[in-house]
Amino acid sequence: KVLITDREFHTVIEAALALLEHPPLVVDVDDPEYGEGRAVSALDYEALLAEGDPEFAWEWPDDEWQAISLNYTSGTTGNPKGVVYHHRGAYLNALGNQMTWAMGHRPVYLWTLPMFHCNGWCYPWTITALAGVHVFLRRVDPQKILNLIRDEQVTHLCGAPIVLNALVNMPEAAKAAIEHPVQAMVAGAAPPAKVIGAVEEMGIHVTHTYGLTEVYGPVTVCAWHDEWNELSLEERARIKSRQGVRYPTLDGLMVADPQTLEPVARDGNTLGEIFMRGNTVMKGYLKNPEATAEAFRGGWFHTGDLAVWHADGYVEIKDRLKDIIISGGENISTIEVEDTLYKHPAVLEAAVVARPDEKWGETPCAYVTLKAGFEGTREADIIAFCREHLAGFKLPKTVVFSELPKTSTGKIQKYL
């Protein structure tokens, strides 16, 4: 076992090592851009590489089903699980990325997506196989992202919608630095239509995908049709917010009744759960056979995401199964309410959760982070704005102004 770390984490690493009777080999990466902290080990990463034998006879896996890595779910539900990846799924999804995004040779890829998240959606392998350039970023900083796009001629980047939201809220002079086309792949909660439109105006083409840790990252894509380019910006943004169709490397995708597994009607209205199966689905959860069996009940992987199926085969998520609000017997999509909140000129970030209510059972409660200069915005202002765009029963009954807790990948932690 080898632990590779750097100065930023020296405090927690030293504390962890002190608890071990037999600590593993520790290797330090000395990042010149991070001058604080101290080295934990006397062995430097570059020195370790210099000790290597270029003629070493590597042992290849006996079969493609062998485990290649262990990734933990992000914990947005408060219960992270260890997801075991296999070699076949990893290389197939790496190929799926290239095919789906039509990436040519030698792309310049900016790591706005953490590499530890679903193995960086398999892009460490995709970009390397295409002889591309990896441009690394220690943390998401919108000004630095814009600078690197310009200076390194970045062609591709990935991440959660919050990354795009940070870019569109930069000063106009900073955004003007983008002078060449940039491809951005986003996943997670659907980007608000307003954000997609603003990013397009910056010269960044957004491809919306969807996936989970259990399926190696993105496995569906909102594949774009040329005729959609003739639509209005608002209509294009609405279409781009859909999660789309399956990757060519995913065997099966359906929206179905979570109990019977019967596919729902492709009418764009009937709710069901998204199910997947194929070679780009995990082996299972580490040392958790009960959770694995439940996740694959009926021979399909249960995502826990509620969606509708459109007539053209495109999937559109409406909410997490655990996030849907049931108020007076009516289902309320938190995503729909959040999308409305993002249209308010004062709202920087928003999350909607269920709040217990004696009369209705549950009502929507909105947590909102305001943009700089809009500190005078009141709860009544937000609710009045929503009333112009939503049915009465969907309105937030409570608005809380605060910073929103996030995971290390930028996802909002609603369960907190």
Name the predicted role of every residue range.
Residues Y91-V108, F116-H156, M170:
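Conserved AMP-binding/adenylation subdomain of ANL enzymes
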Residues R246-F275, A311-D312, G373-E379, Q413:
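Conserved beta-loop-beta connector loops within the AMP-binding
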